[in-house]
Curated annotation (Swiss-Prot):
PROSITE patterns: MAPK, PROTEIN_KINASE_ATP, PROTEIN_KINASE_DOM, PROTEIN_KINASE_ST. It comes from Alternaria brassicicola. The gene is HOG1. One of its GO terms (biological process) is stress-activated MAPK cascade. Dually phosphorylated on Thr-171 and Tyr-173, which activates the enzyme. GO terms for cellular component: cytoplasm; nucleus. This is Mitogen-activated protein kinase HOG1.
Amino acid sequence: MAEFVRAQIFGTTFEITSRYTDLQPVGMGAFGLVCSAKDQLTSQAVAIKKIMKPFSTPVLSKRTYRELKLLKHLRHENIISLSDIFISPLEDIYFVTELLGTDLHRLLTSRPLEKQFIQYFLYQILRGLKYVHSAGVVHRDLKPSNILVNENCDLKICDFGLARIQDPQMTGYVSTRYYRAPEIMLTWQKYDVEVDIWSAGCIFAEMLEGKPLFPGKDHVNQFSIITELLGTPPDDVIQTICSENTLRFVQSLPKRERQPLSNKFKNAEPQAVDLLENMLVFDPKKRVRAEQALAHPYLAPYHDPTDEPIAEEKFDWSFNDADLPVDTWKIMMYSEILDYHNVDAAAQEQENNGS
């Protein structure tokens, strides 16, 4: 039985195994507190995320289960990886991942990014998205604070708690407004992997300009700002709007022409602007896909089709429509954690035998 140690962080009890020391708070999210720590086993710095009251409601239990399943399944250099997971005696769940020094939001608010960094960061975001999308997963909440970066400029996408299955009937209202694709705002359903490309385009534009591209005060204002730059959505896109109120609102807007992005991004190189034009397209079906974007001339210095892997198998979303009581989610979670440790131990043993 692992020995647990308690510490108070921001008035919250952190109850972790003695394997981890030097706890320091690094961030507070809606669903958990994150601390940095030192892993005594590997001597590496790690991030430990405490999921607050994971078994308080069926909705929270399912959300935690989904994040755990995704972290276990997604294994890629540009996706945050799970290094440990445990349930404390108080029945809180802790995810342990690698620790990266900063995130893109902090970088963007501290100084302008040089061209080669913008290029390299965008390449890594798209490389990660190619993999995630090939697994049948849509992130849905891509924004600068969910993109972690270390001192070597290695980049990893994190926070898959909101991620969902690729499903033509998707519903919801999730990503931070500035980075939210118009089809989420307009229909609240029928969206797919293209929403992440829109978000990546907004992040790309912010790296080029040093400030958010579409800083809307609310949904209506957000959409208005988008149309000022990209023009009124084409009729065939407007026809896909399911909500009567939204349809009336969009039809009431003055007709606007799309502005050439080269007028707004005067200091950006033409290839960067061309790629951005292909990412920020109203019609999701005409928006560039991650693997197409990786092959764009702007990313030629980094593009290597032999080193841009896809997932070996699709993520299993069969649990996602389940409406289960907390106790059942708890049993399923325990089972996943046991499986994680068994697989991890088997891999370690194989590594030891092979060396």
